[in-house]
C-alpha cells in the first residue's frame, strides 16, 4: 500500500470508539465519535493555503483530504468534541510510501503541523509529528475495508516520556 491507496481506503464516514489513558493525570477516557473523511482537489483553496504556508510546491502534493469529527467523551458528557482539518501528503522523491504530511490542525496541539509518515511492509501507516511542547506518534491499519484500528501516543517534546496513549477501533458507516 502507498499513501494514495491509504487515503482512498480512508475516504468515507467512520464511527470511532477510542479509549485513552492520560498517564500524566492518571485518568481513563472513552470517546465515541463520527469521523468524515473526504478527498479534496489540489485546486481547493484550503489545500493551496496550507501548501503555501508550509513552503511546499502544490505540484508535489498527492491525495489531499479533509477530516471532520464530532463526538462525546465520558469525561465531560456535556461537551461536544468537534473539529476539522485539511491534510496534504507530500511524498519523498516520488516514493509514495514515505514523506511529509501537512496538517492545518495538529493532533497534539491545535496549530498547523508538518509530520513525517511512512507505510510499513504490513501496510501500517505511521505518522510522527513534533510540536513545540510535545510529539505525537500515530499508527493506523486496516483489518478489512470497513474496519481500521488506530494507536496514538502523545510524548514529551524530547520523545522519551509518554503523556497519553489511546486505541481506537473505527467502523465504516
Curated annotation (Swiss-Prot):
Enzymatic class: lyase
One matching Pfam family: CpeS
InterPro entries named in the record: Calycin, CpcS/CpeS
Gene3D superfamilies the record matches: 2.40.128.20
Enzyme Commission code: 4.-.-.-
Gene Ontology molecular function, alphabetical: lyase activity
Domain of life: Bacteria
Keyword terms, alphabetized: Lyase
The family this protein is said to belong to: Belongs to the CpcS/CpeS biliprotein lyase family.
Function (record text): Covalently attaches a chromophore to Cys residue(s) of phycobiliproteins.
Name this protein carries in UniProt: Chromophore lyase CpcS/CpeS 3
Species assigned in the record: Trichodesmium erythraeum (strain IMS101)
